[in-house]
Regions:
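Pyridoxal 5′-phosphate
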Residues: 1-184
């Protein structure tokens, strides 16, 4: 018997989801940026999906960007934000997904950004006091901390991290790919 435990990374598609998607996989090939009828129909479906996802995440539809996956989303946000906002420092954890760590390495190598690693306890949970200390000494920074790590099972309190970042007016990014379907 085979047992598969990495369902957060890739999982069999639920039959209800497949049934909803099938018509678009078979006939939904219109370019949503086109002005012709098929393009407008597909654009409407995409925008309904965007609104539904925004509602589930308690945010605005304009804040939802579709990418090919978590790695692309992490790369896009971290690189664009650090470069466009001219941030000096990225504060992260050594337990982050490689997409985050590789983006940080690239920014350090190519844009001379400082990378600071926040400490964590033996369970992989971020030390909030150390995070705050790093933010105090690095005011023009981006904090990127994942919510949950599928390899070690830790959960970081992203609400508290978000409040600390807000207090210091620091941009906060969290890779929630592993947990988004499990928490409100």
């Amino acid at each position: 018997m085979n047992v598969y435990f990495d369902n957060a990374a890739t999982t069999p598609m639920d039959k209800k989801v497949l049934e909803k998607m099938l018509p678009y996989l078979e006939n939904g090939f219109g370019n949503p940026s086109s002005i012709h009828k098929k393009g407008r129909e597909i654009k409407s479906v995409i925008e309904k999906c965007r609104s539904k996802i925004a509602s589930l995440l308690s945010c605005e539809p304009g804040e939802i960007f579709f990418t090919s996956g978590g790695t692309e989303a992490d790369n896009m946000f971290i690189l664009n934000t650090a470069i466009e906002k001219k941030l000096d420092t990225i504060i992260t954890s050594k337990l982050e997904h490689h997409a985050v760590l590789h983006s940080c390495e690239y920014l350090e190598r190519s844009y001379k950004k400082n990378i600071k690693f926040v400490e964590s306890d033996e369970k992989g949970v971020i030390d909030l006091d150390h995070l705050e200390s790093l933010m105090k000494s690095n005011p023009n920074s981006l904090v990127t901390i994942m919510h949950g790590n599928n390899e070690i099972g830790n959960l970081n309190d992203i609400k508290k991290i978000s409040r600390i970042c807000e207090q210091y007016k620091t941009v906060f990014h969290s890779d929630t790919v592993q947990t988004v379907g499990h928490y409100n």
